[in-house]
Design a protein with these regions (language model features):
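Short beta-alpha connecting loops at secondary-structure transitions
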Residues: 1-11, 229-237
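Flexible, low-complexity linker and terminal segments
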Residues: 19, 24-268
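Active-site glycine- and acidic-residue-rich loops that bind
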Residues: 14-17
Length: 268
């Protein structure tokens, strides 16, 4: 399916405001649609957050633009030509040059110069360019934020979005029960390499999310090739915002189960 899209995952209205500006820059730089993922809790409920602030000195990032001067210098322009190896080609504004830099394109097969083709190898070449661009996006999107437990631990938790405030409180409840977890808040997809590293550094990682299918867990497994057994799904989907009590209860019960010492088999 068509799943390779860039997603931004804010935790509250303040971060959503900031990510909205980031989304416009990313759309220009990556030349693709950027989805700013708001859930109903953030979009409709009252929430405490940092004041919304805007920097009037901020400049738009228009990405790779080929100018009339560059065209006059003889630069090789192809609308889908990857000259830098990052999957992102140069583009031109309409009317940039009277005779150069214009092109016609279509939504099906085309070559690096936007010319129609039905040749399979050319189609595959463009698909591979899109793969490179998606990999490039990993280092452009907002990176995950990690917070380590007060004590060394081999357990972690991954979460995103409006789960954040409940998770902060849940960590305190879990620590009171003697359970310590490092945590990683994912803020964008495609995932930065630190997501795979975080999973690899822990014996078990709880993936807490507010849907019935464990979609984030599936993405982490599919994108990083992680053993599913090591990612424990904690899902909440009754239509109300997730609570710290629910998170602490689900994780705490699983942690208690891990600490149970099995009885040795009786020797006759």
């Amino acid at each position: 399916g068509d799943t390779k899209h860039v997603l931004l995952l804010p935790e509250d209205p303040a971060e959503a405001f900031e990510f909205a500006a980031v989304a416009f820059d990313l759309a220009e730089r990556l030349q693709t649609t950027i989805f700013l993922m708001l859930d109903l809790d953030i979009g409709m409920n009252h929430r405490l957050c940092r004041p919304l602030r805007w920097d009037d000195a901020r400049q738009y990032d228009r990405g790779k633009i080929m100018t009339a001067e560059m065209l006059d210098e003889g630069r090789d322009f192809g609308r889908y030509l990857d000259v830098d190896g990052d999957g992102i080609p140069y583009r031109t504004y309409p009317g940039t040059h009277p005779t150069k830099g214009s092109f016609f394109t279509r939504g099906t097969s085309r070559d690096r110069y936007a010319r129609y083709t039905e040749e399979g190898s050319v189609y595959a070449d463009n698909v591979q360019r899109l793969v490179r661009k998606f990999e490039t996006a990993q280092d452009m999107v907002p990176r995950p934020l990690q917070a380590n437990a007060a004590k060394p631990t081999k357990y972690g938790v991954i979460y995103f979005g409006s789960t954040s405030p409940a998770m902060d409180e849940a960590i305190e409840l879990l620590e009171a029960r003697g359970h310590h977890l490092n945590r990683l808040r994912i803020r964008a997809f495609p995932f930065h390499s630190s997501v795979a590293s975080f999973a690899a550094d822990h014996d078990f990682v709880y993936v807490v999310e507010q849907n019935s299918d464990g979609q984030l867990r599936s993405l982490i497994i599919n994108e990083n090739g992680i053993d599913p057994v090591r990612l424990v799904s904690i899902v909440h989907y009754d239509g109300t915002p997730i609570t710290a009590r629910f998170i602490a209860g689900a994780i705490g019960d699983h942690q208690d189960h891990l600490k149970v010492t099995p009885l040795r088999k009786a020797v006759s």
